[in-house]
Amino acid sequence: PSALVPRAGSGRGPEARTEPVPDEVALAFHPRTLAQVLLLRTHLQGDDRTDRFILGALAGILHGKTASYLSTIMPNTFSMAPRYVCDYVARTGYEPPARDAFDALAAKLGRLFRQPLPTTAGIALHGDARTAGRRARAALRAHGLPDRARLVVTSPPYLRVLKYGYYNWLRTWLLGFDAAAIDAELDAAHRREPY
């Protein structure tokens, strides 16, 4: 059976064992690396902008094929299916490399801050892209900025990506989200018109 750990972002200690670590998550990481990821997952708060930035950086190094990633079991572009991960480990005897999550995160943050911060003010919004225009105008006005966007970056959904949550299940687990709930909420029509 899986170990029970505190919920993502709860800030609780090890005594607050409320949710299991999925087997496919445990198989993806060296035990020491997993312990560090669990500590970060528990104590970083998604509603704090600094912690959210750090969580984003951590999600970016969660899995990939080079030494800068915490797990090498899958590419960094998407997560292999959970069942595939379990089958792959059983079939190949895959042993995850020991990585220091804190060192890897520090290196990632160093790469992110290699260039100076932009001098132009901006905003970031979280929500449905179909209502982004109205929300962006209001947020820009609230910050004393002109109420028209000059650049919009959205993610997800991507057209023709059918199951965004499913293909990012390891990252959604890290952030405390349910991949199936994300897929149920996203537009399955994959048409440009609603946007």
Regions inferred by a protein language model and the residue ranges of each:
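SAM-dependent methyltransferase catalytic-core segment centered on the flexible catalytic loop
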Residues: 135-151, 157-195
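Conserved phosphoryl-transfer catalytic core
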Residues: 1-46, 177-189
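SAM-dependent nucleic-acid methyltransferase catalytic core
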Residues: 32-154, 159-162
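Charged, low-complexity, helix-prone segments enriched in Lys/Glu/Asp/Gln
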Residues: 1-4, 104-112, 168-170
